[in-house]
Design a protein with these regions (language model features):
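Preference for intrinsically disordered or flexible, low-complexity segments
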Residues: 2-183
């Protein structure tokens, strides 16, 4: 797969971004801080969330993948045993394990720059195992290539989820309806 091109790093969410998020996940955002990556279609596909939700609940997932097309494709990888295979490789390959630990440290550093969550792990199983490819891919998209080796690897396995168009209808692009359509 050709990976999505890098986009302007971390942008403030617009009203249209918040609406896209609501359409993507079927709920309003919680703890939304920024758009961490945009899909080639222009919609947000990774958001940066606060380390604590508005009610104070710790939320260790800094980068949250929002695109339902990407989420579905990653779910297929998970169902096909990719996480188990990656975890086995971590145990057998010290260089991969060291690079994955560095990805974990990067994730924690970025989260702690916002607010330190003591005694909370990073996400996705880092640094010792692979528990959630969604988190690893979100980290790779937000941080860029070369930071999370297993996120980069999973991203390379994905089809071009954006190729057939946006996962949601951008605000203002809804198809026009006539009075006949309303009957």
């Amino acid at each position: 797969m050709d990976t999505p091109p890098p986009t302007t790093p971390r942008t403030e969410p617009t009203d249209a971004d918040v609406e896209a998020f609501k359409q993507q996940l079927g709920r309003p955002p919680r703890g939304l801080r920024a758009i961490a990556h945009r899909c080639p279609c222009g919609q947000p596909d990774v958001v940066e969330t606060a380390p604590r939700l508005p009610d104070g609940t710790p939320f260790p997932t800094l980068y949250y993948l929002t695109c339902p097309k990407a989420n579905s494709a990653i779910g297929t990888l998970e169902a096909n045993g990719v996480m188990k295979e990656m975890t086995e490789r971590l145990a057998a390959d010290p260089e991969l394990a060291a690079a994955y630990r560095a990805a974990h440290e990067d994730y924690i550093r970025r989260r702690d720059e916002i607010e330190e969550l003591r005694n909370f792990p990073s996400a996705g199983g880092m640094p010792d195992r692979v528990k959630c490819l969604h988190v690893l891919v979100a980290h790779s998209l937000a941080a860029g290539p070369g930071v999370n080796p297993l996120g980069d690897e999973a991203l390379a396995m994905l089809p071009q989820w954006w190729r057939k168009g946006p996962c949601v209808t951008p605000p203002g692009d809804e198809p026009a309806t006539s009075k006949e359509d309303d009957r």
